[in-house]
Amino acid sequence: MVRSLIRRVLGRQDVGVSNAPLELPPSDSRERARAMVMGLQDQICAGLEALDGEGRFVEESWVRHEGGGGRSRVMREGRVFEQGGVNFSEVQGEELPPSILKQRPEAKGHPWFATGTSMVLHPRNPYIPTVHLNYRYFEAGPVWWFGGGADLTPYYPFLDDARHFHRTHQAACDSVHPDLHKVFKPWCDEYFYLKHRGETRGVGGIFYDYQDANGTLYKGQDPSGPAAQVSASLGARPLSWEQLFSLGQANGRAFLPAYAPIVEKRHPMAYGDRERDFQLYRRGRYVEFNLVWDRGTIFGLQTNGRTESILMSLPPLVRWEYGYTAEAGSREALLTELFTKPQDWLGDASLDERCRPHGAIN
């Protein structure tokens, strides 16, 4: 029924005025997208259990009354990970929430389907960064799109870690199209930004949303920002459904090679109360972003999603300190001054000179 509706809507003469994709998705689009994100959840969980060595994910399946469900997998008190979760969800409904209609008003009145996998890991050792991942697919009548990304949030600065994470995801993007990373990297800096703090959430990675067969790559909310400017300079870059499917698959599979070497390098490093206190303080920024700015959290709550799964991204322990200022010249100051601001991690050689005096390169 939905696909015949798509064809009827696309056949209307006013479609050219809308933002609806000109390309219909494959007839098995939902099944393939579901299988892809479920497969990523399985692969990532297996890899993380091997990386931790002791912790195991506990799975809880859930059903959404309005349609759909998912499986939440949570690891607690592992050797490496204090807490981490990897979710899969598949939900559908009749009425779209305001957060979606604001971006894609042409989807109004159509039954919708969304599936995705999301992950957040909070390591115990402050020298190991927190990491987040999300890959998703959405359909509603004439509208479909892919979205996703991965970003790294260090608590102590190591230039090599930031470069490795970015380099690995750049290669995954380049495997689909060489222009993608040029837009998705600054888009990540833009999205994971705490406006009330004037900080990025971390060193970024990649982020993309509303990717269909139309127009330019950037479909964000800042038409004058760096991502929009790069996208405009590139012109139209329409990607097919198959290319966008491959993009999510390639970057999802790149996660373990991007993150596991960082964990293996940092986990043996000794730390004390100072480092732990700073980690808990910086985790506060993570909580602030997820509860105030994150569109995924807002979408989940507006669609009556499973609250425990939506808030799984929050760290188990966190602290706030009024008026905190890092000691001048400290590693903590370097993190807040350099690693919470957008940087050209792969192209700016001057970053080495700023990090070297602090032992913050490798």
From Swiss-Prot:
InterPro entries per the UniProt record, alphabetical: Coprogen_oxidase_aer, Coprogen_oxidase_aer_sf, Coprogen_oxidase_CS
Q: In which pathway does it act?
A: Porphyrin-containing compound metabolism; protoporphyrin-IX biosynthesis; protoporphyrinogen-IX from coproporphyrinogen-III (O2 route): step 1/1
Positions of the region Important for dimerization? Answer: 286-321
Marked site, Important for dimerization, at: H196
Entry binding sites for substrate: S118, N134, Y135, R136
What EC number(s) does its UniProt record assign? 1.3.3.3
Q: Which Gene3D superfamilies match?
A: Coproporphyrinogen III oxidase, aerobic
Give binding positions for a divalent metal cation.
H122, H132, H166, H196
Q: Which Pfam families match?
A: Coprogen_oxidas
Q: Which cofactor does it need?
A: a divalent metal cation
Does Membrane appear among the keywords?
Answer: no
Ordered alphabetically, the record's keywords are: Chlorophyll biosynthesis, Cytoplasm, Heme biosynthesis, Metal-binding, Oxidoreductase, Porphyrin biosynthesis
* GO MF terms, alphabetically ordered: coproporphyrinogen oxidase activity; metal ion binding; protein homodimerization activity
Cellular location(s)? Cytoplasm
Q: Spell out the family assignment given in the record's similarity comment.
A: Belongs to the aerobic coproporphyrinogen-III oxidase family.
Q: Subunit structure of this entry? A: Homodimer.
Tell me, in a sentence or two, what this protein's role is.
Answer: Involved in the heme and chlorophyll biosynthesis. Catalyzes the aerobic oxidative decarboxylation of propionate groups of rings A and B of coproporphyrinogen-III to yield the vinyl groups in protoporphyrinogen-IX.
Spell out the protein name for this chain: Oxygen-dependent coproporphyrinogen-III oxidase
